[in-house]
């Protein structure tokens, strides 16, 4: 819990680790036991907001896991946003792969749905390919992606299991969050408990199989439930179980990166949730939103470096089938100073609009070396969704890059 306020003419900041009031957390320490609270960092300055965030940006880079992804800032194409919407098929992927490669993308990620013939929400957990969607297997698609010079990726949600997944009926209750003797579920899914070594072994087996069978080098790791206050199984309190699970998950993640140091895993949670540096000190890239209107997305893009480093901030750019030249430009500028998550039906755009996408990606490749060393600035302040003008800047030692947007208005 943290709060900032003004009381009796004094500004105060209160920050604490888990507690019973705010986190349903209680832990009984026996003689000789120890407990380490969650870490916190505070940036103080008399030079204004930009300076405070710049200092925090540098700090975030220091505590982050060293990795090649945040040095190279490669461009990702993902087939979800304003494109396949979680219903991929082999026939639809091939033209997208061709168009993404032609535009200059370097990763190609198959998003949700590759593992189910139809509706899949409450049945996830097996992570086996759908032969209906991919008659010759997902490997045919990932091989084609590599033949086009890109690294293949897939979508996963490895912290949950659907209530109708056959595995959920076969494994014991201690695989899942429990409260009051019953499994915790939300939106027809159970929350897996990573304190359980069998759960971590299951998760390892999925990662190992996807890398071995499909040759993936990128995983979009999503999370779309709300598990509530935690689990009281083998814990002094629900919050104690929650924090212990979270720390076990982070240890599991560290072990994955130790086995596969070149693997890129994106942190995603219903768009841009769970954007904290417990996660982002491990993950190299973070989904920021599933906002599907590019005119609103510029506000999210412009403000995102206040919460994470620019090179970790993944921004969707999705030219529309029915759009025009200015719509493409607006879309591409959304992502130009951050991490490009290209999407949209690129193969169906006019040649002029496809050329604009390629031009933007070519320019991005010339400036991304500066993004990883820059700090954000906001010349006209943080953006709000109703603002006519929005601006984000990145400042390096000898350069300033500016992204400027105008939406609506008559100027």
Would you name each region that the model predicts?
Residues 39, 111-112, 154-158, 223, ...:
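Glycine-rich, histidine-containing beta strand-loop boundary motifs that form or position
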Residues 29, 132-135, 402:
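Hydrophobic beta-strand core residues of beta-sandwich domains
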Residues 44, 48-49, 83-86, 100, ...:
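Flexible loop/turn segments at secondary-structure boundaries
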Residues 70-204, 214, 218, 235:
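Aromatic-lined carbohydrate-binding/catalytic grooves of carbohydrate-active enzymes
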Residues 130-137, 141, 147, 169-329, ...:
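Active-site neighborhood of glycoside hydrolase catalytic domains
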Residues 339-388:
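Contiguous C-terminal substrate-recognition/catalytic subdomains in enzyme active sites
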Residues 1-59, 65, 376-379, 411:
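N-terminal accessory beta-strand-rich subdomains and adjacent acidic, glycine-rich linkers
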Residues 383-411:
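Carbohydrate-binding surface patches
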